[in-house]
Structure formats: structure tokens, C-alpha cells
């Protein structure tokens, strides 16, 4: 089963930058999107063979997630946990016979870490949610998780130590998640690979210089790790400040 995850940084804009051509090229069973920044009625496009599930933020033009799937899920749910987590369209869960798929756009901690306290609460709550699902069947957790976990996952770790996405607090939450029975699929296959990033600032020619961050993930339950055929980062795909990440799973 081939799964793709991509923060498109506004799907309407991405549609004008070859999104449908990308979908044809990817030939994925499931495409998970983050930061769609739209409601489904705001754009019409033809994507034959895929069912579409959307979770839009209350605030127009902000956040949002979507799952496009060739395989009909057993069930689809939106958001999780407390009311505070339910207004920004950040999570969709699709249940398949073999696993739960959780598409997530993790809240950014913002400039001056203005939202770090909320982010910490989110991380604890999403981990609890994933563990609850994992008690029923394996989990595939994907999306823009807004953290570069280790120094190898960011081009310039030193200057970014207190920047959103690379604080000790955020990185420790990822460590805690992985320690609770989950596997970072890319690092499982490529533990020492450098220069592998999924997001680049639009400033300073960051993408041209590959001054990036790996903040987009496929994370799976420990018991799925032997089913990982491949995990990849398609850094050559343009259309957003992020690139797609891909998981091939033998299920």
C-alpha cells in the first residue's frame, strides 16, 4: 500500500502548480494533505478513483487537512480530544482493516514560542490518542508534525535551538512518542542519512541551498516496522514550501 503525505501550503494555489499531475505521477493508494487552507466547495477538480475526506478550520483560509483514498475506509473521524483541539481542522483518522491512518497538521509553536504551552498540551493529548488507537490495531501517523527531531534532521541546528520546531521541548515530545511504541519510518531505514529535508523557508534561497528541515513524517506502530518496504522524501516535487513524503507498506 502506497501512502503519500504533503503539506501543500494552500491547495488552491497548489492546484495551479501541477497538483493533479503530481497525483497521477504518485499513483498512491492514499494521499494525505495538510494546510489545505480551504473548504471543499471552494475548488472543483477531477481526481478519478479517489474518495475525498476534508477537515477544514473554523477560520477561513487557515490550516486544514484532507485524505484522498482509493480504498474505502471502514470509518472516518475528525479531530480528537478536548474542544480546544477541534476548531482548526488538524486531524483526520481513517480506519482500514489493517490499521488506523491518522493525518495530522501539528500546531506551530509560533514566533517567540507564543503557542508553545498549547503545543505541549497537544503533544501529550495526541500521544494519548494514538496509544488508544494502537490498543485496537496498528497505527500509521503522518503529516506535518512541525518538529525536526534530531540535529541530523535540520541543516543548521545551532542557530535554530530556540526556534519553533527545534526547541528541546518539542523534540523531547517526539522522543517520548517514539519511546512509547512507534517508529519513524524514514530513520528506521536510513538512520544516518544527511541532507534529507521536507521543508525549506521561502527566504534566503533555502531550497536551492538545501538549508531545510525534516518535519514531515510517517510514523508507525512498532509492530508494523517489518512491513515497511520503503520510506522516501520527494524533494524534487515543487508546488509548496514542503515536499511530499512517501511510505510503502506491505499490507
For every predicted segment, state its role.
Residues 81-82, 107-123, 158-162:
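Surface-exposed cleft-lining segments at the edges of enzyme active sites
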Residues 7, 23-41, 101, 130-151, ...:
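Active-site beta-strand/loop signature of hydrolases that rely on acidic residues for catalysis
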Residues 1-47, 51, 57-63, 78:
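N-terminal, active-site-proximal structural segment of metallo-dependent hydrolase catalytic domains
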Residues 37, 42-109:
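Structured beta-strand-rich core segments of catalytic domains in phosphoester-bond hydrolases
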Residues 70, 94-97, 221-222, 247-251:
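Active-site beta-strand termini and strand-to-loop segments that position acidic
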Residues 30, 51, 122-211, 215:
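Metal-dependent phosphoesterases centered on the DNase I-like endonuclease/exonuclease/phosphatase
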Residues 60-75, 204-226:
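Conserved beta strand-loop-helix elements of the APE1-like EEP
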Residues 1-9, 98-110, 142:
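Active-site-proximal beta-strand elements of phosphoester/diester hydrolases
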Amino acid at each position: 500500500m502506497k501512502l503519500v503525505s504533503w503539506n501543500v501550503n494552500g491547495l488552491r494555489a497548489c492546484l495551479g502548480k501541477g497538483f493533479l499531475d503530481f497525483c497521477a505521477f504518485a499513483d498512491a493508494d492514499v494521499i494525505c494533505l495538510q494546510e489545505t487552507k480551504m473548504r471543499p466547495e471552494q475548488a472543483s477538480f477531477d481526481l478519478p478513483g479517489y474518495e475525498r475526506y476534508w477537515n477544514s478550520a473554523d477560520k477561513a483560509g487557515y490550516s486544514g487537512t484532507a485524505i484522498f483514498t482509493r480504498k474505502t475506509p471502514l470509518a472516518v473521524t475528525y479531530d480528537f480530544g478536548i474542544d480546544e483541539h477541534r476548531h482548526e481542522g488538524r486531524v483526520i483518522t481513517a480506519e482500514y482493516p489493517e490499521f488506523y491512518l491518522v493525518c495530522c497538521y501539528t500546531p506551530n509553536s509560533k514566533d517567540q514560542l507564543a503557542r508553545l504551552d498549547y503545543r505541549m498540551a497537544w503533544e501529550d493529548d495526541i500521544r494519548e490518542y494514538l496509544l488508544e488507537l494502537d490498543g485496537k490495531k496498528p497505527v500509521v501517523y503522518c503529516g506535518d508534525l512541525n518538529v525536526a527531531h534530531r540535529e541530523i534532521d535540520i541543516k543548521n541546528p545551532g542557530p535554530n535551538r530556540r526556534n519553533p520546531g527545534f526547541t528541546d521541548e518539542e523534540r523531547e515530545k517526539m522522543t517520548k512518542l517514539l519511546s512509547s511504541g512507534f517508529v519513524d519510518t524514514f530513520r528506521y531505514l536510513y538512520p544516518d542519512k544527511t541532507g534529507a529535508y521536507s521543508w525549506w523557508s521561502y527566504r534566503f534561497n533555502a531550497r536551492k541551498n538545501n538549508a531545510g528541515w525534516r518535519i514531515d513524517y510517517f510514523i508507525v506502530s512498532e509492530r508494523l516496522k517489518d512491513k515497511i518496504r520503503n520510506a522516501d522524501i520527494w524533494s524534487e516535487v515543487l508546488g509548496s514550501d514542503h515536499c511530499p513524503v512517501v511510505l510503502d507498506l506491505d499490507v
